[in-house]
């Protein structure tokens, strides 16, 4: 993996300079990741060090190439009985962990209560990250009250698992065949609202979730005249920057938004109350969105 990551990094530099041979080498590297390295990881006993080395191979690649490798790995898993069996075992183990999650009201008690399950989930995700995070999203989507416990339980998941989580989120958001409005034709469907809330909570909590990929997905849906996924962007801004939607701003508040940070903070607090998170966390979240 160390040699592979060095080769990928070198070819990326040459590909940016227009080297056709380097671009061809990157295509072969993507194929090797999808057909060999990712499947081999899912068949080995869970080992965070192995997952970290695999992430070192993937990290230099653009997110589009990484997600393409994840999609190819998922297709290969569906076509292979051995890989499918390994994925099913990981899903069964993940569901056992998720069924035991609970969220005490006190934040410190919640952290202590979820820490053992988070460690178990992190170990499972080191072996089969794609299957594990898909099970987590499938659990949180129909049960919005499970979003916070599931996000807290991912505390010990590595960067590879979080990148797989970004891929799974975008894949489920883009899955066709599900109406994005309720039967009344006015309100957003529950599944879309839950996924948007999950995306916002994950991006606020973990830097390993790729905000650029989510924002690019929203931009692509807008180009296709699909406005409903802007709910994802709204959740990202609300949770990461602490700026919830404010439809009823007065003229004075609108004018105050053109001022400095302190004036903007005061103007928004008048309409929304106290903003989520501390000032440092909001500044870090806003910087990631910029």
Question: Where do the PLM segments sit?
Answer:
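Eukaryotic alpha-helical solenoid repeat scaffolds
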Residues: 1-290
């Amino acid at each position: 993996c160390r040699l592979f990551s060095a080769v990928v990094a070198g070819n990326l530099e040459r590909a940016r300079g227009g080297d056709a041979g380097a671009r061809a080498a990157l295509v072969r590297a993507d194929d090797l990741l999808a057909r060999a390295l990712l499947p081999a990881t899912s068949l080995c006993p869970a080992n965070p060090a192995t997952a970290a080395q695999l992430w070192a191979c993937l990290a230099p690649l653009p997110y589009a190439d990484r997600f393409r490798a994840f999609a190819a790995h998922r297709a290969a898993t569906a076509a292979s009985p051995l890989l499918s069996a390994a994925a099913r075992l990981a899903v069964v183990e993940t569901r056992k962990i998720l069924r035991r999650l609970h969220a005490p009201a006190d934040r410190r008690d919640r952290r202590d209560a979820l820490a053992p399950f988070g460690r178990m989930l992190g170990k499972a995700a080191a072996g089969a990250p794609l299957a594990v995070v898909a099970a987590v999203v499938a659990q949180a989507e129909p049960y919005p009250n499970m979003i916070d416990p599931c996000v807290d339980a991912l505390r010990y998941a590595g960067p590879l698992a979080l990148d797989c989580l970004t891929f799974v989120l975008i894949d489920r958001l883009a899955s066709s065949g599900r109406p994005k409005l309720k039967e009344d034709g006015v309100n957003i469907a529950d599944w879309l609202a839950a996924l948007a809330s999950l995306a916002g909570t994950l991006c606020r909590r973990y830097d390993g979730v790729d905000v650029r990929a989510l924002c690019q997905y929203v931009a692509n849906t807008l180009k296709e005249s699909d406005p409903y996924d802007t709910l994802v962007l709204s959740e990202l801004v609300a949770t990461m920057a602490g700026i919830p939607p404010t439809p009823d701003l007065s003229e004075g508040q609108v004018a105050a938004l053109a001022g400095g940070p302190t004036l903007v903070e005061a103007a928004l607090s008048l309409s929304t109350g106290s903003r989520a998170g501390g000032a440092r966390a909001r500044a870090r979240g806003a910087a990631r969105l910029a």
